[in-house]
A protein has these predicted regions:
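Extracellular glycan-modifying ectodomains
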Residues: 1-387
Length: 387
């Protein structure tokens, strides 16, 4: 076709002309934009350009399958396209969930939990037995804190008629099943302050303030004087988008703020090669502030989920904390009460506890888990294994 006639045709169909120019520009931008290895906002690895390694039917099929994934992951403006999709779904179609996340009022996001799955029930019973066994082996020393999800505190902010299962009733069941431990019911303590900033809107964790109110209840049960927040400077970090956001990617999400207390206490992360044989690894401060420059800002607390670490405190005696990541923002408060706070995370600690406890003669043992982790962590059973 004559170029002049082509231009004339495009003038007759301006929408077609706009789309043609748009896709041509997008094609050029895709060519010149460097590939990304990782999406911070989605918290996922992105597909890289595949290589054709075998000229065969299967080889070509695999190549084109992977190339389709590559184009999808590396398209120019991927983050913005996802946000635009979210805008359309929530405004035009009134969508109230995305990626397994419920989109609630006040910009809150909640993990969807309609019922207890059989696999969760098995893990739940196994973990209850482990905590009970630990309490029986160390009578009078073990406390258990099972932290409710944000949906328990803010049911009014859930989408209309969202059928969340009865998590608070399950916590009651846990208390009845654990007569050998001191059960710390933190739900009521948190509910008394529910108008405050207790849980992140875009993440599954509680905030540093939520952790403090639970810590106060622990101190009351142990007869301890709580950490004096007014005596320490507060640090803040803005623009935190958590794990709920990375799954839902809602267009109008409000970022969270992380706070922490600037404490001089030291943290030692141990290398473990056998039960009772820790070798000193990294010595550092309580916070990895370098994490504030990346997506997973919450990992700044205690440098993430280390298998075994020790915090040097300003009090007396020793405590062992067996935990999930909820405890990472809780543990710094214990520096006011204990001289040594040992922290075990079974996701990265492959041994039992008896040798560790025998070597350190702890004054107290605290098991601290969120409800969601307690129903899904397949490693906590090690706490119930003698040896």
């Amino acid at each position: 076709m004559d170029p002049k006639k082509r231009v004339s045709s495009l003038k007759q169909y301006p929408v077609l002309a706009v789309f043609t120019l748009f896709f041509a520009a997008l094609f050029v931008l895709d060519l010149v934009t460097p590939d990304r290895a990782y999406s911070e906002l989605e918290n996922t690895t992105l597909t890289q350009r595949p290589k054709l390694t075998a000229v065969s039917v299967d080889g070509l099929n695999n190549y084109f399958t992977n190339y389709t994934k590559y184009v999808k992951d590396q398209v120019f403006g991927r983050d913005q396209w996802i946000s635009l999709q979210s805008l359309a779904e929530t405004t035009l179609f009134q969508k109230t969930q995305s990626g397994g996340i419920l989109l609630g009022r006040e910009h809150r996001m909640f993990a969807r939990s309609y019922r207890v799955l059989p696999t969760e029930e098995r893990v739940w019973n196994k973990n209850l037995a482990a905590v009970q066994s630990l309490g029986e082996r160390y009578p009078g020393k073990v406390s258990f804190m099972l932290v409710p999800s944000a949906s328990v505190l803010y049911p009014e902010d859930l989408p209309l008629a969202a059928p969340q299962m009865d998590e608070e009733g399950r916590i009651d069941e846990a208390q009845a099943a654990l007569p050998a431990v001191q059960f710390l019911r933190v739900t009521d303590a948190l509910r008394a302050h529910k108008d405050e900033y207790l849980y992140y809107r875009t993440d599954h964790h509680w905030t540093t303030l939520g952790a403090y109110y639970a810590y106060e209840q622990f101190c009351e049960a142990q007869g301890l004087t709580p950490f004096d927040r007014s005596a320490h400077p507060v640090e803040t970090a803005e623009n935190f988008y958590g794990t709920h956001y990375s799954k839902a990617r809602t267009w109008n999400a409000e970022p969270d703020t992380i706070t922490w207390y600037d404490l001089p206490n030291r943290l030692t992360i141990w290398n473990i090669t056998a039960p009772g044989q820790p070798t000193e690894g990294t010595q550092t401060g309580l916070y990895d502030t370098g994490k504030l420059d990346v997506y997973d800002k919450y990992a700044m607390f205690l440098h993430g989920n280390n298998g075994l670490s020790r915090v040097e405190g300003d009090g007396t005696g020793k405590i062992l904390v067996i935990k999930d990541s909820y405890a990472n923002s809780f543990v710094p408060y214990l520096t006011a009460n204990y001289a040594a706070i040992d922290v075990v995370d079974f996701r990265n600690y492959n041994y039992g506890l008896d040798q560790l406890i025998a070597d350190n003669d702890y004054d107290a043992i605290l098991v601290l888990y969120s409800y969601s982790s307690f129903t899904s962590d397949p490693y906590l059973y090690r706490a119930g294994v003698a040896g």
